[in-house]
């Protein structure tokens, strides 16, 4: 497929770099070229990963509530972002929640990430899921300083079954966006 979608002439987000999820279909233009048609599109909450100086002390202030990372559609690392599909228990869908990705850089583990979640007391009830994306510019800086183009990210989080972790292969983004 080449070029912009057939039903969109400019980004609905302006020049802002965002992660989005879309429902699309393929169609042919008048010359027989395959194009896409966007049925719907929604932006994904996007944040910078946070680099902390004193991670042991500071992690608690970012939250230690439990959530699940969905191992499937939506959980991916690409283009300088870690996008996560998550699920957690809640009673009030409109209650404030904070999710942050902490870069816990050390000599031993230069690419360790900790997902910190603060449910602000609303951590029981029905499960609901969502998406969040984190820009990995701190990881990019560390990897480039170490002369790496590809690294293995080590993500840790608190799950309902206890502490969990997983690994992601990541191709370092080589710009400073």
What would you call each of these model-derived segments?
Residues 30-87:
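Surface-exposed beta-loop interaction hotspot
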Residues 161-177:
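Short beta-strand elements
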Residues 70-125:
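Short helix-loop boundary/capping segments
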Residues 70, 102-104, 116-118, 137, ...:
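A structural detector for beta-sheet-dominated domains
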Residues 8-16, 107-112, 174-177:
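Short, surface-exposed linear segments at secondary-structure transitions and domain or protein termini
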Residues 1-39:
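Start-of-domain marker
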Residues 13-18, 25, 119-160:
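Short, solvent-exposed, Trp/other aromatic-anchored flexible loops in extracytoplasmic proteins
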């Amino acid at each position: 497929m080449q070029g912009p979608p057939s039903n969109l002439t400019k980004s609905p987000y302006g020049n802002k770099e965002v992660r989005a999820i879309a429902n699309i279909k393929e169609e042919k233009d008048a010359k027989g070229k395959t194009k896409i048609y966007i049925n719907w599109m929604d932006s994904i909450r996007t944040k910078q990963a946070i680099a902390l100086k004193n991670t042991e002390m500071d992690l608690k202030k970012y939250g230690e509530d439990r959530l699940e990372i969905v191992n499937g559609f939506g959980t991916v690392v690409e283009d300088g972002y870690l996008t996560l599909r998550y699920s957690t228990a809640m009673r009030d869908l409109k209650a404030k929640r904070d999710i942050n990705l902490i870069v816990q850089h050390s000599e031993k583990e230069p690419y360790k990430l900790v997902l910190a979640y603060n449910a602000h007391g609303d951590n029981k009830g029905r499960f609901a899921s969502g998406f969040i994306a984190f820009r990995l510019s701190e990881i990019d800086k560390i990897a480039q300083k170490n002369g790496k183009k590809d690294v293995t990210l080590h993500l840790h989080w608190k799950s309902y079954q206890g502490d969990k972790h997983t690994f992601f292969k990541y191709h370092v983004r080589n710009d400073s966006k």
